[in-house]
Regions:
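Cross-family detector of peptidyl-prolyl cis-trans isomerase
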Residues: 1-126
Length: 126
């Protein structure tokens, strides 16, 4: 993997006002200057995920003290569509409606039917 040592800290996700979006919303919080992630790439990231409606955190690699590595094509659609184009060193927020996350309510996952907000730091691509 091509990457860098991150000196960033765990992001705080501010509560979101208004109605949940119906499409994926991608916002670059910091633009990186390293290698660019492509569709299906293997990536190394730190992330925080919260529920759009409640603001409650449901997961964070930061809390486990280690980033995670994985191929994008095995992840939720919001990550598959929202990480390509991001550059190493960048921080991006994704707001993923259910069809970009874990599907409609009753889909078998505890987060099915929920709009999710992720802040992702791209540490490496390979």
């Amino acid at each position: 993997m091509t990457g860098l040592i991150s000196n960033k800290t765990k992001p705080e996700i501010e509560p979101t006002l208004g109605d949940a979006p119906t499409e994926l919303v991608i916002t670059d919080l910091e633009v990186g200057d390293g290698a660019e992630a492509t569709a299906g790439a293997n990536v190394d990231v730190h992330y925080v995920g919260v529920d759009f409606e409640t603001g409650e955190q449901f997961d964070a690699s930061w809390d486990r003290g280690a980033s995670i590595q994985f191929p994008l094509n095995g992840l939720i659609k919001g990550w598959q569509d929202g990480i390509p184009g991001m550059k190493v060193g960048g921080r991006r927020q994704l707001i993923c409606p259910p069809q970009y996350a874990y599907g409609p309510a009753g889909g078998g996952h505890r987060l099915s039917g929920r709009t999710l907000v992720f802040v992702i730091d791209l540490l490496a691509v390979g």
